[in-house]
């Protein structure tokens, strides 16, 4: 099962994850530099993992999938070793 949420990346390279029902633009005061969607799941070894993708229409910001997936995995302690 995959769980999809939204996120923003702040200028301090921190990820803020929130439910899909909330608009990205609700976080505009945080001065996001990118935004999109994050999917959570389980990898082939049974460990939690995540993946960032998409864009925010309400903020007009794209995601940077590879960079932001790494940021998310580091901050959420989901590194694939």
Identify the residue ranges that each predicted region occupies.
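Intrinsic low-complexity, intrinsically disordered or marginally ordered coil/linker segments
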Residues: 1-81
């Amino acid at each position: 099962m995959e769980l999809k949420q939204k996120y923003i990346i702040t200028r301090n390279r921190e990820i803020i994850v929130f439910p899909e029902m909330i608009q990205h633009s609700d976080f505009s005061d945080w001065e996001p530099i990118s935004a999109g969607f994050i999917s959570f799941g389980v990898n082939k070894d049974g460990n939690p993992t995540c993946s960032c993708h998409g864009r925010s229409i309400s903020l007009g910001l794209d995601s940077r999938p590879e960079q932001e997936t790494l940021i998310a995995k580091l901050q959420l302690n989901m590194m694939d070793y």
